[in-house]
């Protein structure tokens, strides 16, 4: 697997801008819609767990787990964008991820932020 397969985040969404900042340079917030989130929980695969355990003994990247986490984050972000779009937003401000263990059987990834309507400053 190449490093490109573990790229950071989703590609741009043409109708919903997602940023980690409070505002967008050159734009003004015309409406704050509120919190939106995208959530997914992935179960842990026994084979991956065994492989990860062995790999952790000798060191190095756990590529299978890295790939799963990238896919999981992408799915959570896509759900966040879908929710923002459904509520009439064209932007999500203060975007963040939260990752937690889910009852020792999986991993929960939550993408969250503030849905808003922005427009170019005139």
What do the predicted segments below correspond to?
Residues 1-48, 107-122:
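N-terminal presequence-like segments and the immediate start of the first folded domain
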Residues 8-15, 52, 69, 81, ...:
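Terminal helix-to-tail segments of small alpha-helical proteins
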Residues 21-24, 97-102:
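Short, solvent-exposed loop/turn elements at beta->coil junctions and helix N-caps
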Residues 36, 41, 49-96:
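Short, well-ordered alpha-helical segments
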């Amino acid at each position: 697997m190449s490093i490109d397969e573990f790229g950071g985040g989703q590609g741009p969404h043409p109708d919903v801008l997602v940023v980690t900042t409070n505002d967008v340079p050159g734009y003004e917030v015309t409406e704050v819609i509120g919190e939106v989130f995208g959530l997914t929980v992935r179960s842990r695969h026994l084979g991956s767990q065994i492989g990860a355990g062995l790999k952790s003994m000798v060191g190095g990247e756990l590529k299978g787990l890295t790939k799963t986490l990238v896919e999981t984050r992408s799915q959570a972000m896509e759900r966040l964008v879908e929710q923002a779009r459904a509520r009439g937003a064209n932007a999500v401000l203060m975007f963040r991820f939260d990752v937690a263990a889910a009852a020792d059987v999986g991993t929960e990834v939550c993408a969250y932020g503030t849905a808003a309507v922005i427009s170019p400053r005139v």
